[in-house]
Amino acid sequence: MKLSYLDLMTSDPSYNLAMEQYVFDCLPRDRMYFMLWQNDNAIIVGKYQNTIAEINEEAVRERGIRVVRRLSGGGAVYHDMGNLNFTFITDVGESNALDLKLFCEPVVRTLATLGVKAEVNGRNDITIDGKKFSGNSQYIRQGRVMHHGTIMFDSDLFVVSEALRVDPTKIQTKGIRSVRSRVTNVAEHLPEKVALPEFRRILLENILKENPGEAYPLTQDDLAAVEKLRAERYATWDWNYGFSPACTMLRRRRVDGCGMIEAYITVEHGKIAALTFKGDFFSASEPDELAAHFVGCTPDRAGYEKALGDVDVSRYFAGLQKDELIDILCEG
């Protein structure tokens, strides 16, 4: 089958995911497409995940991390400019059962040429010495498959763990939780130093050696349609957060001079549907009155600040200030 490739130069995650969908939905189906792309400082969550359950909201806010939902299932991943993403888009005929190894092996073979022994391991990972450096997922519809994967080449592993860190004892969700795995960077295993741009070039060359092809000539109409899709879906709160299934979060903290405060937060479609306070605190007014202020707001610092407004929190939790309550709701 003829192959066309797109080597994307933007690092905007909402644009890159919009481009994937546009290629999948709109470009001619008489060929296979291969894409290379990078996202800068982003968390990409799986289609069926609860965004709030997957991210460290404080780290996301402080580091300016962009959060975008993709079309395929699977777990949440952190992308920075030390990570390279690849995508195959092609027809699969009548069968929707496709082995992910088919699309992972070109990465394995490319690494072999650089002296690194990698292997496809488990359901959707590529590993080196048992450590994961590539996670893969697929979106299949109407006889067509989009297979995409990450390649952690020289990512900041501290930020990878921090951005996705959520205490599993504090949250219950109907969405699909990401499976945390031991991870590694490809660069650590290379016998000779190779920069990421050079690796990107080598991978593309190897793909084209196995599947001769040429760059796909996107038109101005194509680019305008991608931008429209980005703006209307991948850059929207409704898609990235509001699509989330229901979850219940527990935030708890003991505060000197106040006591133990527990907040049970139920989130549906990305907004608070219910909130219940429990604990051994003293209260001059019923905490349920305060809890009602939060219904309909987003479960983040901005949402909590808006919900509380100029409410005197100490009426409901003796000895507690508004900023302290917001910290509890955000961090536990």
Language-model-derived ranges and their functions:
Residues 83-124:
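Contiguous, small/hydrophobic- and glycine-enriched helical/loop subdomains that border
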Residues 1-98:
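N-terminal lobe of the biotin/lipoate ligase/transferase fold
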Residues 90-96, 187-193, 278-283:
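A generic structural motif
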Residues 223-268:
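Structured beta-strand/loop patches that form or line metal/cofactor-binding pockets in enzymes
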Residues 137-138, 151, 253, 261-279:
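Short beta-strand elements
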Residues 107, 114, 134, 142-241, ...:
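Long, positively charged amphipathic alpha-helical accessory segments at protein N-termini or as interdomain linkers
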Residues 70-85, 126-128, 132, 137-146:
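FAD-binding core of FAD-dependent oxidoreductases
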Residues 39-41, 120-130:
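Short, glycine/charge-rich beta-strand/loop segments that flank catalytic centers
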